[in-house]
Every structure is written in C-alpha cells, then in structure tokens.
Amino acid sequence: MLFFSYFKDLVGQEVTVELKNDLAIRGTLHSVDQYLNIKLENTRVVDQDKYPHMLSVRNCFIRGSVVRYVQLPKDGVDVDLLHDAARREARGG
C-alpha cells in the first residue's frame, strides 16, 4: 500500500508513464487505485513520430500491470518521507 498512498498524494501533478510496449504518455494524474491502475488527463505521447495514432487521445486509463515506469516531478518527491515509509512497511508496521 506504500506506493498507492504515495501516488494518491501526486494527484493533480504531471507525470510520465512508460508502458511495457515502450509507449510513453505524459499527462496530469487524475486518479490511481489500489491495483496501481492510472487515469491521466490532458495526455500527450512523448514520441509522437513513433505513435501518430495516439495524437488524438486526451484522457486515458492505464492498467497497472502494463506500466514499466512512472516518472515523477522533481518537486513531488520527498525522499526522506519515502525512505521512512519504506522502512516502516519493511518492518511490518
């Protein structure tokens, strides 16, 4: 649940989601659920030449199991807080 809580705090910020098929989509994080399914708004494809058929997509739902990486905004990451939460989760409490 660590990452679910973390991503919930990022709602409203711009993120880039890279999928396992190498498609990278940048957009505003609208919502995330416990399965780490992601809903983005105001989306745009990072490599528009490679994926021209995706140019008209403005909102999308991404299944969590197809996500390879999520790139976060630099100011959206509190590293100390994330380390503390990871330690607490690893200890089971």
Curated annotation (Swiss-Prot):
InterPro entries: LSM_dom_sf, Sm, Sm_dom_euk/arc, U6_snRNA_Lsm2. Residues 2-76 form the Sm domain. Keywords: Cytoplasm, mRNA processing, mRNA splicing, Nucleus, Ribonucleoprotein, RNA-binding, Spliceosome. It comes from the Eukaryota. One of its GO terms (biological process) is mRNA splicing, via spliceosome. This is Sm-like protein LSM2. Disruption phenotype: Embryonic lethality when homozygous. Component of the heptameric LSM1-LSM7 complex that forms a seven-membered ring structure with a donut shape. The LSM subunits are arranged in the order LSM1, LSM2, LSM3, LSM6, LSM5, LSM7 and LSM4. LSM2 subunit interacts only with its two neighboring subunits, LSM1A or LSM1B and LSM3A or LSM3B. Component of the heptameric LSM2-LSM8 complex that forms a seven-membered ring structure with a donut shape. The LSM subunits are arranged in the order LSM8, LSM2, LSM3, LSM6, LSM5, LSM7 and LSM4. LSM2 subunit interacts only with its two neighboring subunits, LSM8 and LSM3A or LSM3B. It is found in: Cytoplasm; Nucleus. Belongs to the snRNP Sm proteins family. Expressed in roots, leaves, stems, flowers and siliques. One of its GO terms (cellular component) is Lsm1-7-Pat1 complex. Component of LSM protein complexes, which are involved in RNA processing. Component of the cytoplasmic LSM1-LSM7 complex which is involved in mRNA degradation by promoting decapping and leading to accurate 5'-3' mRNA decay. The cytoplasmic LSM1-LSM7 complex regulates developmental gene expression by the decapping of specific development-related transcripts. Component of the nuclear LSM2-LSM8 complex which is involved splicing nuclear mRNAs. GO terms for molecular function: RNA binding.
